[in-house]
Amino acid sequence: MLRKFILGLLLASQAVAQLPHKERDYDSRVYVALSLRDGLDPREFEASVSGLDHGQWTFEHPVGTIPNTYVFSAPKEYAPIENIRDQDRLEVAGGVLAKRELRKREKLQKKYGMSEEDVEKRLVALERLDYDWSERGLGSLEVLSERRIHKRAPVNWTEEEMEYLKEIKRRAEEAQKAQDDKGDKKEDQKDDKKEGQEAQKEGDKEDNKGDDKEDGEEDDDDDEDEDDDDASPAMPVQWKPVDESMYGGMPDDSLYDVYRKYYPDEVGIKDPSLWKQWYLHNVHKAGHDLNVTGLWLRNVTGWGVVTAVVDDGLDMNAEDIKANYFAEGSWDFNFNKSDPKPSSHDDYHGTRCAGEIAAVRNNVCGVGVAYDSKVAGIRILSKEIAEDIEALAINYEMDKNDIYSCSWGPPDNGQTMARPGKVVKDAMVNAITNGRQGKGNVFVFASGNGGSRGDNCNFDGYTNSIYSITVGALDFNDGHPYYSEACSANMVVTYSSGSEHYIVGTDINAIDDKSAAPRCQNQHGGTSAAAPLAAGVFALALSVRPDLTWRDMQYLALYSAVEINSNDDGWQDTASGQRFHHQFGYGKLDASKIVELAEGWNLVNNQTSFHSEVKTVSQKVKYNEPLKSVITVTRDDLDKVNFKRAEHITAVLNLEASYRGHVRVLLKGPRGVVSELAALRRDDRSKDGYDNWAFMSVAHWADEGEGDWELTVENTGEQDQVELVNWQLNVFGEQKDKREENKEGESKPEDENKEGEKEGEKKPEDENKEEGNKEDDKGDQKEDKPEDKPEDKPEDTPEDKPEDKPEDAPEDKPSDEKKPEEKPEEKPVDNSDSSSDSSDSHTSWWPDLSSKKSAWLYGAVLLVGGFIAVIGIYACVTRRNRVRRNRSKDAPSASSFEFDLIPHDDSDDDFVYPEDTHRRSGDNDRLYDPFAEVEDDDDMFRISDEGEDAHDVEPELNRVSMEADKRDNDRQNLLG
């Protein structure tokens, strides 16, 4: 026990050592996040730049586990970049730093009141810093500043919107009053008629009493029929246990007993708020829920999975959270302490979200979707926070935290267009590459609550990322809530507030009164509530298949989604076989379906990507005259990067506009699927246009990628000036498997489902001819695939990493051991069969040379040996060239960084070289950054070409090597 305690302290101290421990003085110092050349010690860099005329820079600390990324600071009065902190982020060096600033000359003068002389001084200082620091190993530079990150809370209505709503309400009241007046008039007529009938009855009563009675009854029936003809047809009424009091408090025993009649008895859960949790099991409207109770009956409850709720804190002492709280994965980054407990009554958001995921089954409030999973709290929303601290937060304990649930982002005001800083991007890349022991963390982001403002989640750099699963909201009636944002990045939707129903469950305890009873809440909502429900569903899937990668989870979410409101015109057929809608993504999450699909899922192949040349357009977009531009992708382009099928598409745009909200951008793929990349936003009056903005879409999933990709830009403002400067197409997808890679163009779709055809083995048909009726027919054994998976789903491959590493290979069939109901792994069975078949004969390690059956083995061995020899020679040559390139001191080379963004520069992707556009596949040791930016091809204020990455073309390699040799000679002369 003591050893475990000491080990825990050591691990905790190591984690804490990566956190900043002192308050920053932003008033007197400038703080920057630097990425340095691979292997360069930050102390060495600090010493090398201290003697330069750029201020006294001090190394502060590394940024978590992000490779080669560090925080430095300097006094503001000596730092040439002091006033960048209050302006647009500066994210690049290596020859393009000053160029970006030069493009902002007019903006700097007008927006920030800088004189022309001050701008010139700034540019000169930046030019010198850019050249000097890049020469000493700087890869990128980002000036850090504190900012507020916004919860996905309901958006307040504007005065204009309130007036509009009042007008709608007034008209509705007038219509209701008119209907009531009509009803009153009809009632008066009915009363008069009845009075006359009664008088007539009374006069004839003695003569025809019996007949009068019958006549009176018939007249009454006629009156009722007349009323029915005028009345509106009755609408079906849904059964509800209660009305106004439905969300007013805890139910009494009688109501609870009534509800129990409609709830599965086998579940056996008695948490008092369970009857309100309609999204877990809806007795009001069958099927309008997560379909999760059947999984609970199978004991699929999230055991072994940890979800980190990145939010405004977590009340770990709440009765519904305490037993499932995971302290090791928790930290308060706002106040730099291990306890993320809220300190304000306003910080309830994270606790409510955590309860949706993992509220304990304990007769308190309700239960979470995955009520046996663990939940951690990472606090970042309670006050302003710098970008590097945010990066630390989303990387915190990424080997222990599996899922990060994020219900926050830029303001949902229909005006903001914001993306995370470079250091945050790098943290996300680090998490999906190295988190969960290399399988990648799963990021779940709420789409946003700005729907009523016309906001769109493609203008949010978090939801617009290929690394995120973007989740929108669905209301009680399976409708689209007014607040939930639509966009082409929406993957799925799930339930939240709407139609007078809410998400209920856990709440924070009283802040000041520790003796208070546990508190439950009845009105959680927005996309803030949808994302945690999705995270809980993903926790269930990971509990049955912990080997799933971050990309596998996206596949599972897509292929298990249930289409809703199928008659809506917004649905489009896609290559995936699933239909897509910008409001609903691929449909609503179904917990049972995603778990069932996960249990038989074969891991996808590694990621690859194709990146087109930057297409320069430089054309004005006239009012109501759409501008079209086409980029054509050929089969040869895709074969070069070992491309099989598409997953995410990004289009990186540079566009100028006098009224950004009046611009609409569409992307039409080869199969005719249309992604609305940029929607109209009435409140977005910005004149900044799009500055290297990467719009992302999941609507083209499973597309082959080959063909014309047509971009359409529309200008809907009659007086507006719009110009499309340039754009670039990026297609991310799955690699072909090994067999297809070696026999390119020969494999048929059906061959992809056969695991027996490994490299060097015989074809199944030849093997069957020779084996005859033997029991060990490997091809037949391995053909079984889940029926609900896409028809071209690949076979098991090494676990997904953006980079290929030899150690990944043995983990290519982890799913078998997780499924006791299935057969054991085929290979051991085959070995036992073959040994039993040959028990009567002489057993030898070597096959009989005279046997035709084994002759192919020797040929295969020779081929493999030759292949290894060729690879070895190639590796030696490549290593020698890489070493020569790494000697360049003007900027880090392509081989210097673990994560190469676009190989035309080190980090910010501002320059794109036309001759280096057919980018690399996942086989290479680089990962493309989907936040990538492109730059027009002008050369103003360009400092040095050596600051860019080495190209793949031979002439460029020779040039870089010669220049590196020359610099080394110059350096020796200076030192001598």
Curated annotation (Swiss-Prot):
Enzyme class: hydrolase
Keyword Repeat found: no
Organism from which the protein derives: Yarrowia lipolytica (strain CLIB 122 / E 150)
Active site, UniProt feature: D311 (charge relay system), H349 (charge relay system), S528 (charge relay system)
Span of domain Peptidase S8: 277-595
Keyword Hydrolase: yes
Region annotation (Disordered) ranges: 172-246, 733-848, 914-976
Stated name of the protein: Dibasic-processing endoprotease
TM segment ranges: 524-544, 855-875
Pfam families recorded: P_proprotein, Peptidase_S8
Acidic residues bias spans: 213-231
Residue stretches of biased makeup (Basic and acidic residues): 172-212, 734-830, 915-928, 940-976
Residues annotated as signal peptide: 1-17
